[in-house]
Amino acid sequence: MQTPKRRRGAQGCPRSSPSPPLLLLVRAVWFCAALSVAAGSFELTILHTNDVHARVEQTSRDSGKCTGQDCYGGVARRATKIRELRAKHRHVLLLDAGDQYQGTVWFNFFKGREVVKFMNSLRYDAMALGNHEFDNGLAGLLDPLLKHANFPILSANIRPKGSIASNISGYILPYKIINVGSEKVGIIGYTTKETPVLSNPGPYLEFRDEVEELQNHANKLTTLGVNKIIALGHSGFSEDQRIARKVKGVDVVVGGHTNTFLYTGSPPSTEVAAGNYPFMVQSDDGRQVPVVQAYAFGKYLGYLNVIFDDKGNVIKSSGNPILLNKDISEDQDIKAEVNKMKIQLHNYSSQEIGKTIVYLNGTTQACRFHECNLGNLICDAVIYNNVRHPDDNEWNHVSMCIVNGGGIRSPIDERTNNGTITLEELTAVLPFGGTFDLLQIKGSALKQAFEHSVHRHGEGMGELLQVSGIKVVYDLSRKPGSRVLSLNVLCTECRVPTYVPLEKEKTYKLLLPSFLAAGGDGYHMLKGDSSNHSSGNLDISIVGDYIKRMGKVFPAVEGRMIFSAGTLFQAQLFLTWGLCVSLLYFIL
């Protein structure tokens, strides 16, 4: 922070009385310093959440169902910390960067009413739309969220087309100017332009380039005399950084979508930091722009303090996400409202399906980066559901299943309730209500799909394919588009099923989520037409029936997906290089 000039800081200082001189001198110095800061700067505290995904109740360490003592998050605990920080700081904004919808039985049952109720109760100041806010179509966004929220809902890069424009006019705003004390703060929203392939917004919404639209509205705000601008949105950490670099006038970026954990210092829980908090980006016009996210699932509350000079420039930013653990009590009024709504859920969510005797790893860190045993279980269940009577040529008509890692939304802990799996827990794993469909596809297109699976591996996106009836070997040291070293599939025209090399010109049958069959997550090569695509059963019904039939499940990680020695060598090389640089730094 820049030190104010002495003459300016001295203006208006009271004269000291002779008695008692020391006490009065201290008070005078304190008062003058406070006056100096107030005259030349403005401090803003930004509390923020992103990717909460219907975690109304407190959760386990890995954001599944919590029944023990080691619990995190939940709206009641968040309310306590927000109230505390509002009392501590004078100028506070509470913001959400999207994806409040979808993820637990709460959303499946209440369809977003729970989101509106508790966001209103916590008095959010603004929210940006995430892709999952469109999971129930535009109608499911309009009512309840858009019609009943007591706070502005923002996205500058969504443009309605045709008659739909009049239906949502005034509900989705590009920006909002909020009076904070004597200052005006502009907040511009943005939503990932990948939303049409990630969710269900329908054909009448256009998702434009984030940077271009943000710049247009930042220019408008500047013209209106607003010199403190926050970009609040849901496009992922890489896009957040691009916005910070490219958009003139944006002072702070509050993001979401990639569940990015940023932290300065030693992390307080199991999440590994992707960088410091705030993550500082130098803009193309030479400014330092803080970029923040707060992981996901309401486990943390983002906590950023920003000091602006009198021209609206950021001169200091600091903070860290606050871990909402058991040391923070739950607000009893909010807790009572949660329990009241929970009564309606009980019969729906408490149905017992079966048991697991192993941890079903459905975490982001597992299923989006490598083979996960919950992905194996899901696809094995889908194959089992499609076993038919053999004939003279085939033991079964289909042997292969894929599911995108981003479609697996929660783990199931075998140490909770003696391994009992309830409908609530299974709904948290597969919350989207999709089907597993049958597709006929050429081997060349399937190979292309597996290249797409790892084209940006390591960024935590949801495209990585979990499989059954397929064995794939990747080399991430190669360029995207040429990373599949081998792809073997389980034969069907055989008496003893074995894995054989994929034939590019052969047509195969493949089981996959309806989301992927519609081209979701960028899998345009899987998008089928009515001649080669047959709709199947509900995903949660398929997996639930399989678990019921098995009674107890214990899926393993089996080497269905392998990253080659070349990839491992590259990782070791980067690690060694990083250690050498660190060692050299300390030596010098």
Curated annotation (Swiss-Prot):
GO terms for biological process: AMP catabolic process. InterPro entries: 5'-Nucleotdase_C, 5'-Nucleotdase_C_sf, 5'-Nucleotdase_CS, 5_nucleotidase/apyrase, Calcineurin-like_PHP_ApaH, Metallo-depent_PP-like. A lipid is attached at residue 564 (GPI-anchor amidated serine). The record marks 132, 135 as: Transition state stabilizer. Expressed by the venom gland. GO terms for cellular component: plasma membrane; side of membrane. It catalyses: a ribonucleoside 5'-phosphate + H2O = a ribonucleoside + phosphate. It is found in: Membrane. Gene3D superfamilies: 3.60.21.10, 5'-Nucleotidase, C-terminal domain (3.90.780.10). Residues 565-588 form a propeptide. Its cofactor is Zn(2+). Zn(2+) 2 binds at residues 51, 99, 131, 234, 257. Its EC number is 3.1.3.5. Disulfide bonds join 66-71, 367-372, 379-401, 491-494. Glycans are attached at residues 167, 347, 361, 418, 532. GO terms for molecular function: 5'-nucleotidase activity; metal ion binding; nucleotide binding. The keyword Transcription regulation does not apply. It is an enzyme of class 3 (hydrolase). Belongs to the 5'-nucleotidase family. Hydrolyzes nucleotides into nucleosides. Snake venom 5'-nucleotidases are widely distributed among venomous snake taxa, but there is a lack of information about their biological activities. They have been shown to inhibit platelet aggregation. This effect may be due to the liberation of inhibitory AMP or adenosine by its action on ADP released upon initiation of aggregation. Venom 5'-nucleotidases are also known to synergistically act in vivo with other toxins like ADPases, phospholipases, and disintegrins to exert a more pronounced anti-coagulant effect. This is Snake venom 5'-nucleotidase.
